[in-house]
């Protein structure tokens, strides 16, 4: 049976003349709309999700709109189109698809037999949209572009999250430009967790910061002073590349009051010529830290290696591959031809 999920149009309260959705504590501004989502989008103080949708539709429409639709589809023709999974995977982007359809034509009605995060098998019809055929076709490609990408991310995330257990899988900032929140939302739908959203919500001391500061300890000390002077409270992570750097961080933390919360263990997974990996350095670092801080493994993380990495006791495993080079899930949206012809004959247009 198909279930109908209500959709509430979202308007940012301070933009009366030009409604825009600015994502703050969630991408939805009303309580009911938030509660209707299976997985809420991550928080972002400035991300304009409605603006992203409008931009995607605008780049497709250009200055003349859909000239093919205008030429071939009667403006008042009603139709129904079905979402079809063309391969197995995890579906993500249902909530976003509803936002896009509503932006194109608020009169369109959607029904779904599944939720975001559910598994689909090849050949399954898992949703439908009803209304003006013109509107459905105009929205089709933008909806599918988002849904296929999000579903690809969610599918890989689910596989990696299952394999990484008991470690938690994270994505990175290696997202498609302009789609940061959308990509990270898909990771949540797939069962992963979000790393920092951007440069603003977590201090992350990486190799370039360490080089510029003159060493790991100096970089940490500068961060601690900065946070204290500016009365800021947020997570602090430092990248380490060797066991010596791990010892230096632990040394610093034992002698100084610090805001440090997590230690990244970068490229401590060593690929071997036989295709396996050596995690002995990573395991040594985790044992050395001994639960005093969260740990994050990074580098040489794939679906094939993530299980072995997860068995080292590391808290988190981050993978840029979740978002920077993911394969889209094959999904189509097809108009019910018989229904369209029936309506066309009835209105003497077919």
Curated annotation (Swiss-Prot):
EC number: 2.4.2.19
Family statement: Belongs to the NadC/ModD family.
Any one cellular-component term (Gene Ontology): cytoplasm
Entry comment describing in which tissues the protein is expressed: Ubiquitously present at low levels with higher levels at the apical meristem.
Molecular functions per Gene Ontology: nicotinate-nucleotide diphosphorylase (carboxylating) activity
Entry's Gene Ontology BP terms: alkaloid metabolic process; NAD biosynthetic process; nicotine biosynthetic process; quinolinate catabolic process
UniProt: substrate binding residues: 141, 172-174, 196, 206, 239, 266, 298-300, 319-321
Keyword annotations from UniProtKB, A to Z: Alkaloid metabolism, Glycosyltransferase, Pyridine nucleotide biosynthesis, Transferase
Signal peptide (from-to): none
InterPro entries cross-referenced by the UniProt entry: Aldolase_TIM, NadC, NadC/ModD, Nicotinate_pribotase-like_C, Quinolinate_PRibosylTase_N_sf, Quinolinate_PRibosylTrfase_C, Quinolinate_PRibosylTrfase_N
Protein name according to UniProt: Quinolinate phosphoribosyltransferase [decarboxylating] 1a
Reaction catalyzed: nicotinate beta-D-ribonucleotide + CO2 + diphosphate = quinolinate + 5-phospho-alpha-D-ribose 1-diphosphate + 2 H(+)
Pathway membership: Alkaloid biosynthesis; nicotine biosynthesis; Cofactor biosynthesis; NAD(+) biosynthesis; nicotinate D-ribonucleotide from quinolinate: step 1/1
Species the sequence originates in: Nicotiana tabacum (Common tobacco)
Main function: Involved in the biosynthesis of pyridine alkaloid natural products, leading mainly to the production of anabasine, anatabine, nicotine and nornicotine, effective deterrents against herbivores with antiparasitic and pesticide properties (neurotoxins); nornicotine serves as the precursor in the synthesis of the carcinogen compound N'-nitrosonornicotine (NNN). Involved in the catabolism of quinolinic acid (QA).
Origin: domain of life: Eukaryota
Gene that produces this protein: QPT1a
């Amino acid at each position: 049976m198909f279930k109908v999920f209500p959709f509430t149009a979202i308007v940012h309260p301070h933009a009366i003349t030009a409604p825009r959705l600015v994502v703050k504590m969630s991408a939805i501004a009303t309580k009911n709309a938030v509660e209707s989502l299976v997985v809420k989008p991550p928080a972002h103080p400035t991300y304009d999700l409605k603006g992203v949708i409008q931009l995607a539709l605008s780049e497709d429409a250009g200055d003349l709109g859909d000239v093919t639709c205008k030429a071939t589809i009667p403006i008042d023709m009603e139709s129904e189109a079905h979402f079809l999974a063309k391969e197995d995977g995890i579906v993500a982007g249902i909530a976003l698809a509803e936002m896009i359809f509503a932006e194109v034509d608020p009169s369109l009605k959607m029904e779904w037999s599944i939720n975001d995060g559910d598994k689909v098998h090849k050949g399954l019809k898992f949703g439908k949209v009803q209304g003006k055929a013109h509107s459905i076709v105009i929205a089709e490609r933008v909806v599918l572009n988002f849904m296929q990408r999000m579903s690809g991310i969610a599918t890989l995330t689910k596989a990696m999250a299952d394999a990484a257990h008991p470690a938690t899988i994270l994505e990175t900032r290696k997202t498609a430009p302009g789609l940061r929140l959308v990509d990270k939302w898909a990771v949540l739908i797939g069962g992963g967790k979000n790393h920092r959203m951007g440069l603003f919500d977590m201090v992350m001391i990486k190799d370039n910061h360490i080089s510029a500061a003159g060493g790991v300890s100096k970089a940490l000390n500068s961060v601690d002073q900065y946070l204290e002077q500016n009365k800021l409270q947020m997570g602090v992570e430092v990248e380490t590349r060797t066991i010596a750097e791990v010892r230096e961080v632990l040394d610093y933390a034992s002698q100084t009051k610090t805001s440090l919360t997590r230690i990244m263990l970068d490229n401590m997974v060593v690929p071997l010529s036989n295709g396996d990996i050596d995690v002995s350095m990573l395991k040594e670092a985790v044992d050395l830290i001994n639960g005093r801080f969260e740990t994050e493994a990074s580098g040489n993380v794939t679906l094939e290696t993530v299980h072995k990495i997860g068995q080292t006791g590391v808290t988190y495993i981050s993978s840029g591959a979740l978002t920077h080079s993911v394969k889209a899930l094959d999904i189509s949206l097809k108009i019910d031809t018989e229904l369209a012809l029936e309506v066309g004959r009835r209105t003497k247009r077919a």
